[in-house]
Amino acid sequence: MKHEPSVTSALSRRGFLKTSTLALGTAGLAAATSAEAAPWFSSGRKLVAKNQVILFQGDSITDAGRSRDKEKTNAPNNQPGLGNGYAWLAAAELLVGRPDDGLKIFNRGISGHKVFQLADRWQADCLDFKPDVLSILIGVNDIWHSLDPKLNYKGTVEIYERDYHALVERTQRALPKLKLVVCEPFVLRCGAVSDKWFPEFDRYRAAAKRVAAQHHATFVPFQAMFDVAVKYAPPEHWAGDGVHPSPAGAALMAHFWVKAVGA
């Protein structure tokens, strides 16, 4: 059996920093687009084709302050509608690299949401778009809100996984040709993230990975990425509160998302 290179062995300090489009100019961007820059992160799949609709879904990490103005959110490739986070930066990278492909990219992340809240709005905010590629990043609120007694949320990892499976099954029934991307929930050990998150948070990550595997989705291991990133800059550099990525964190996510979908 051929083994994938490990995260730590595949990346030198220089190689890792080259994968960040923040770090360097044109030469760095060229290096970042090569498969050699991060072989452990490439899924080997080519998900994005011409004239496709790409939809980002999730919570505040995806939302990233996007506009709620219908004219802006219903227009593809619109910066206010895409927000200020990784979804916008991933869209920008796709649109720079594939200017003639007619891609239409949307963001429907909503701050604070958990899996069951995605399900409540799924018809209008996902299925009606008929996306060709759907990317979901969800899970941090499913644990975070359960840790805050003031919110009185009684969620568990079992509820999270059950609801996630149901959401994906519903989506794949409605859109049988859909290409699905499941992003790994992640946190960094700073800010709002304390020891009480663990080891339970790792169970949520494992659940998301099982959902991806069962439904043949491309899995984007963001936690693995940030676990390497903190070797070269402190956690606060990537996400000041441990949950919401900084500009550097969002840019790193965007670049590796694009790598993972083979675009």
Cite the ranges covered by each PLM segment.
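Cell-envelope and extracellular/periplasmic
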Residues: 54-56, 60-62, 67-78, 107-113, ...
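Serine-esterase "nucleophile elbow" of acetyl-processing enzymes
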Residues: 38-108, 123-130
